Amino acid sequence: MRQLKREVKIGNVTIGGNNPIAVQTMLNVPVEDIEGNVAQAKRCEAAGCQILRVTCPSAADAKCIEAVKNAVNIPIVADIHFDYKAALACADVGVDKIRINPGNIGDDDRVKAVVQACQQKNIPIRIGVNGGSLEKHILAKYGAPVPEAMVESALYHVRLLEKFDFNNIVISIKNSNVPRMMEAYRQLSAVTDYPLHVGVTEAGTYQMGLLKSGMGIGGMLLEGIGDTCLLYTSPSPRDAHES
């Protein structure tokens, strides 16, 4: 039985509720190569990808996000790691969703700035917790990125966004250890109604990545957990999607 979550609209795709589970992939062309990103995005769309994630290391790289968005008819997610100004720039060009780890982009004022930019354009935020980059105080408490640690990190960031009256949220808690990842999603799904983005991080080689991602993502979906999933284990995102 699928665990129904609240609906979140990502461009022209709605996840959560009884909506179909949306399949994502991620471009792997250097962000400076705008033409290469656009060409790869078109191939992914033709292969049936429903949501496309593009990395954006800096504010200047938002021009790649804009070019890709203008070239395809599927939602574009900006993957932000450390520079909150990159998130602001992506919101300005009308990206469909922003992925951040709030703990990596600075103090609360920077998080608030991103939230306000997303509120103005109704852009959802995915809180992307990664077992390899948990907060120091959480690692000190648990000693390792165990499921309880990842869930605590996710809920901490959810509360931070909610503090700024923002609830247009999707959550992911990825780990390269598949059993840990699966247990973390079970625990998280039991305590939140935000839609869940399911994936395995640092999955390894193509063959190993397919195996680990198939076990982790497939296992969660069989348990009724997950509203969108992402696979990016291959040199070709199209190959990953078709797998």
Sequence positions of predicted segments:
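Single conserved hydrophobic/aromatic residue that forms the stacking wall/gate
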Residues: 232-243
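Conserved anion-binding
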Residues: 106-164
